[in-house]
């Protein structure tokens, strides 16, 4: 015979998202905030909260940033400590983190634009060290198959 339980708490259709968010918070939030720095002094969202909101969109089957406001906000607000920001806040933070392109003109006169995204590349490396994907003192080769 099947056991039936009656739950009094509210449920979310995105089963498991809260455990993923809690794992993210325990592993990467402090790394993100220490790498990217303080975003605002009083009220507002930290960069880790903004990146977590962005991540939640895609882990919940969303396809655009606006999905956090239109579909997820009500469900993610069920978590007792989670602060989820709006799509406008996510877009402002992405703009804050951008860097200007660097232009290079070759000897033949051809112009090239590139972007080193130093801050975000540093964040990527710090997150990979924090999650154990890279080890301090190890050597890694990175190459591209074509």
Q: What are the language-model segments listed below?
A:
Residues 1-146:
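Dynamic "connector" segments at or just before major functional cores
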């Amino acid at each position: 015979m099947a056991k039936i339980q009656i739950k009094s708490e509210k449920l979310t259709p995105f089963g498991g998202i809260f455990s993923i968010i809690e794992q993210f918070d325990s592993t990467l939030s402090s790394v993100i905030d220490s790498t990217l720095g303080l975003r605002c002094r009083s009220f507002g969202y930290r960069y880790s909260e903004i990146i977590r909101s962005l991540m939640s969109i895609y882990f919940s089957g969303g396809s655009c940033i606006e999905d956090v406001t239109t579909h997820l906000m009500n469900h993610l607000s069920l978590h007792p400590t989670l602060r989820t920001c709006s799509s406008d806040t996510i877009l402002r933070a992405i703009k804050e983190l951008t860097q200007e392109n660097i232009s290079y003109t070759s000897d033949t006169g051809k112009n090239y634009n590139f972007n080193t995204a130093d801050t975000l590349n540093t964040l990527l490396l710090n997150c990979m060290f924090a999650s154990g994907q890279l080890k301090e003192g190890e050597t890694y080769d990175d190459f591209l198959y074509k």
